């Protein structure tokens, strides 16, 4: 085997190894809590072997107050309630979507409301409930 063939073989093996390492790191998801318009999210590797990326859109009082959580979970939990909000008679709509592709939870929900601080609190509570389901 000539040194040129050996170099080509070594390069091919190295390329395959590098491509495999990227996939071995697992699913990558956006992660942020209480996202409002213009906020950015960090990219994290999902710690779960067969996890999912999650995007939770929350609107309070109809569409006046809106925001979003993004994270990774072990499995898709579509039925997340807000038990503390039942005491306040707030109308809360939560939509959860799950996906399994890298950075697939990228869609950001726009927000335009003076109730932004209220949404941040509600979204933080919603994300705590999501994590508690694990």
Curated annotation (Swiss-Prot):
Disulfide feature: 29-53, 32-41, 76-98, 99-104
Listed GO CC annotations: plasma membrane; side of membrane; synapse
UniProt feature coiled coil, ranges: none
Transmembrane regions: none
Pfam family of the protein (one): UPAR_LY6
Cellular location(s): Cell membrane
Keyword Glycoprotein: yes
Residue positions assigned to the propeptide: 106-134
Every UPAR/Ly6 domain range: 28-76
Main location: membrane
Lipidation (GPI-anchor amidated asparagine): 105
Keywords, ordered alphabetically: Cell membrane, Disulfide bond, Glycoprotein, GPI-anchor, Lipoprotein, Membrane, Signal
GO BP: any one term: acetylcholine receptor signaling pathway
GO molecular function: acetylcholine receptor binding; acetylcholine receptor inhibitor activity
Membrane topology, as annotated: Lipid-anchor; GPI-anchor
InterPro entries, A to Z: CD59_antigen_CS, LY6_UPA_recep-like, LY6H/LY6L_nAChR_modulators, Snake_toxin-like_sf
Entry superkingdom: Eukaryota
Signal peptide segment: 1-26
Protein's recorded name: Lymphocyte antigen 6S
